[in-house]
Regions:
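N-terminal capping/lid subdomain adjacent to the active-site entrance of alpha/beta enzymes
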Residues: 1-207
Length: 208
């Protein structure tokens, strides 16, 4: 858990976690990276959040124990989440609204495109956002009135018995959930069996 403090009343909070063992490694990694934020001008960070991301994952020594994967990546997530949380608080908006109100240029600058330019470039993203600017207010109004679907993972964790998977699915259906997430990565046969159990329990019309 990271708390990013400023010389004002604002502070940002970010978290990361493992499934149990290893949280102390995340803490150690955050402590190793915190020098990159101490005494920084926060407005300089928010001018180009994509460049900020690139800077904190590019430490010439910490790259030897990363880069951008494993415990270093988990620590980076906590720090970056704290930065975004602080940014939203400074602007006096919930984070979703901060993002919605960004200009296309600001939004594109918040992304590090270096690993995805074979699929989309900054210019491509900018053009997509600019084309859709005219419908932004309408889409925001729809979200505010209708909400946005969320999913539950309560039944989808690895290691649950078949009976527990089924009962948790049915409980979630009774609570109104319509989207279900299933963890995969064990034996493929087990994943297929678990998916079948979940599908039978949630029915054909809900998303898995």
């Amino acid at each position: 858990y990271v708390t990013l403090k400023t010389n004002s009343s604002h502070c940002g909070n970010g978290l990361t976690f493992t499934i149990g063992r290893g949280n102390e490694l995340c803490v150690a990694a955050v402590n190793a990276m915190k020098y990159m934020l101490i005494d920084r001008d926060f407005t300089e960070i928010t001018k180009n959040l994509g460049e900020f991301w690139r800077s904190i994952v590019s430490d010439s020594q910490l790259r030897w124990v990363g880069p951008e994967k494993g415990v270093i990546h988990l620590a980076t997530a906590a720090i970056v989440n704290a930065v975004w949380d602080l940014y939203a608080k400074v602007e006096g908006k919930p984070l979703w609204k901060l993002l919605v109100d960004m200009s296309p240029e600001e939004l594109v600058r918040s992304i590090d495109f270096r690993y995805i330019t074979d699929v989309i470039t900054p210019q491509d993203a900018l053009e997509i956002l600019e084309i859709n600017l005219t419908t932004r207010e309408k889409r925001e109004s729809e979200i505010l009135s209708q909400g946005y679907p969320a999913y539950t993972t309560s039944a989808g964790w690895l290691g649950y018995s078949d009976q527990k998977i089924e009962s948790l699915c049915r409980e979630s259906v009774d609570k109104g959930w319509t989207h279900f997430k299933m963890k995969v990565g064990g034996k493929i046969e087990d994943d297929i069996r678990r998916a079948s159990i979940m599908r039978n329990a949630i029915g054909p019309d809900r998303k898995l």
